[in-house]
Amino acid sequence: MEYEKKYIHSSQLFVAVRPSVIQTVLGSCVAVCLYDSKMQISGMNHYLLPLWNNDGLASPKYGNIAISKLIEAMEAVGCQRRDMVAKLFGGASPNNFNAQNGMLVGEKNIQIAHHILSEQRIKIVASDLGGTRGRKISLESNSGRVMLKYVQKTEF
């Protein structure tokens, strides 16, 4: 099967209605992957910070916005919320990078994903979260399968 490849950056999301491989690289950011097995459609977001503070544009840079927008985008192509499942990745804290108010940004990003998905009654079926290493993930849209590789630190 021929797969279209789509790479998403921080603050982006993508829903694949044709067989695709959606990829991203994560550090403290989190990616939520949604899959509807009845429609065989998947989507992924990649957000940088947990919560929009109501200042400026409500961007998918923020977890609460990115997750809501991803759910809406899946519904816009015919998916039903009750048929969606989620897989979560990222939220690393390399060398305690990005500490804010005693809690690391990666940890806050993880918490907001759990909170919103629970609130929306979307079951989390797999996750690889936290730790100190980055991740590269690839989502096969028609199966919902995610391949993960850890990013190793290299010094020159």
From Swiss-Prot:
It holds the Pfam family CheD. GO terms for molecular function: protein-glutamine glutaminase activity. It is an enzyme of class 3 (hydrolase). CDD domains: CheD (cd16352). Belongs to the CheD family. It comes from Sulfurimonas denitrificans (strain ATCC 33889 / DSM 1251) (Thiomicrospira denitrificans (strain ATCC 33889 / DSM 1251)). This is Probable chemoreceptor glutamine deamidase CheD. Its EC number is 3.5.1.44. Keywords: Chemotaxis, Hydrolase. Transmembrane segments: none annotated. GO terms for biological process: chemotaxis. It catalyses: L-glutaminyl-[protein] + H2O = L-glutamyl-[protein] + NH4(+).
